[in-house]
């Protein structure tokens, strides 16, 4: 069974870009559009997966996200968070909150194919 891939963003263009990369690697991405949807999806996944969080355009503030997902994902899920390079202040805040590997959006796009192939 393929590892679940969840993307938290409201950015429709970026959703399309991530889904294209995923399809090119034979994967499918689920876009989560609400905090309730996130909890239901995480609880409903029998397999651990990859949670990709847009720190600027997530469906709710990432500070709130961090507190909600810690108990749901634990060590089972890998989390990658990304931000625009013009908002570099988000990096330290996200790392402090434990939102996984945190990187600029441009780097995320660059490493995404290899990341998906490694799962």
Could you tell me what each predicted segment is?
Residues 76-85:
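A short, hydrophobic beta-strand element within the central beta-sheet of small alpha/beta folds
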Residues 3-12:
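Conserved acidic segment of CheY-like receiver
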Residues 112-119:
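A charged, well-structured terminal subsegment
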Residues 34-50:
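Acidic, metal-coordinating helix/loop segments flanking the phosphotransfer/catalytic sites
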Residues 86-100:
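Alpha4 helix (beta4-alpha4-beta5 surface) of REC/receiver domains from two-component response regulators
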Residues 27-34:
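Short hydrophobic/Thr-rich beta-strand motif most characteristic of the beta2 strand and flanking loop
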Residues 98-110:
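Output/docking surface of receiver
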Residues 52-69:
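Conserved phosphotransfer microenvironments
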């Amino acid at each position: 069974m393929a590892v679940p891939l969840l993307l938290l963003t409201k950015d429709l263009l970026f959703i399309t870009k991530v889904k294209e990369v995923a399809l090119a690697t034979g994967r499918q991405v689920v876009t989560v559009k609400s905090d309730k949807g996130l909890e239901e999806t995480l609880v409903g996944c029998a397999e651990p997966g990859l949670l990709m969080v847009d720190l600027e355009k997530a469906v709710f503030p990432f500070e709130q996200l961090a507190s909600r997902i810690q108990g749901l994902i634990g060590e089972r899920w890998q989390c990658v968070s990304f931000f625009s390079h013009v908002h570099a202040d988000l990096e330290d805040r996200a790392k402090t909150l434990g939102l996984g590997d945190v990187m600029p959006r441009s780097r995320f796009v660059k490493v995404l194919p290899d990341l998906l192939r490694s799962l």
